[in-house]
């Protein structure tokens, strides 16, 4: 990977990891355009995921610190932490699906699946315009539902994680700010756990990897990830999550026509 490719991939990952437009699909399309072998470039993608997780931790540093204190000492934050862990535990479904249907693992690199996933999540995002919401904190049922939505996004390339989880939260009655906040909290263990799972599953050698571009990709993803978080929080707070629907549908259709 060159430094130019590292900057490009970091930019794509940083902007699209949190905006509900599927970072994996955008990376897949970008890597196809750059002529890179996506199955051989595990570590650059892992670096960008770590960069975006760092962006969440920095953006919500006060919230994470407060949750840590309340979880240890007791308080309302302990319940939130347990609900995040409950939602994250749903990811065992992904492992079970991969074991039961090994062919599903190849969906990650399939442009057709990414195109269909994008169009599907686009329709879902459009539907959130009519979701009724009000409560500020997720229930156990809502946490499980958002966790299962995260599973679907992990299995079906193109199905945005943030779009699926935030949208599900809205349909289960959360107000936009609470849905987005809980989705970001869920993203930290999910993304880190997913990266570790991919590394162990792929068993890619690290000794021949050029660390310079990898580190650069992670830093770029961190910077643009912060900007994307702020943009999404602003739009979701205004009830405009559905704005991303037409873009996902259009990009999915274009990818199907030109890349399939």
Identify the residue ranges that each predicted region occupies.
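Multi-pass membrane proteins that catalyze or facilitate reactions on polyprenyl-/lipid-phosphate substrates
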Residues: 1-260
């Amino acid at each position: 990977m060159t430094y130019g490719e590292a900057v490009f991939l970091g930019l794509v990952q940083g902007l699209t990891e949190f905006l509900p437009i599927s970072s994996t699909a955008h990376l897949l399309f970008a890597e196809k355009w750059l002529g890179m072998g996506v199955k051989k470039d595990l570590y650059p993608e892992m670096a960008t995921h770590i960069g975006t997780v760092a962006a969440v931790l920095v953006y919500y540093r006060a919230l994470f610190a407060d949750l840590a204190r309340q979880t240890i000492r007791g308080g309302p934050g302990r319940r939130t932490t347990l609900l995040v862990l409950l939602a994250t535990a749903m990811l065992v479904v992904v492992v079970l699906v991969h074991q039961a249907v090994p062919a599903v693992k190849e969906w990650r690199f399939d442009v057709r699946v990414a195109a269909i996933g994008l169009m599907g999540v686009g329709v879902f995002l459009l539907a959130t315009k009519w979701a009724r919401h009000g409560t500020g904190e997720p229930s156990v049922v809502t946490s499980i539902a958002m966790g299962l939505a995260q599973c679907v996004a992990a299995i079906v390339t193109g199905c945005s994680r943030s779009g699926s989880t935030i949208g599900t939260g809205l349909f289960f009655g959360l107000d936009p700010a609470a849905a987005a906040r809980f989705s970001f909290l869920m993203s930290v263990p999910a993304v880190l756990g997913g990266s570790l799972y991919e590394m162990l599953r792929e068993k890619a050698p690290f000794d021949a990897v050029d660390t310079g571009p990898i580190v650069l990709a992670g830093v770029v993803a961190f910077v643009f990830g912060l900007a994307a978080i702020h943009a999404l929080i602003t739009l979701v707070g205004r009830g405009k999550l559905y704005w991303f629907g037409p873009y996902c549908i259009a990009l999915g259709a274009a990818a199907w026509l030109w890349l399939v």
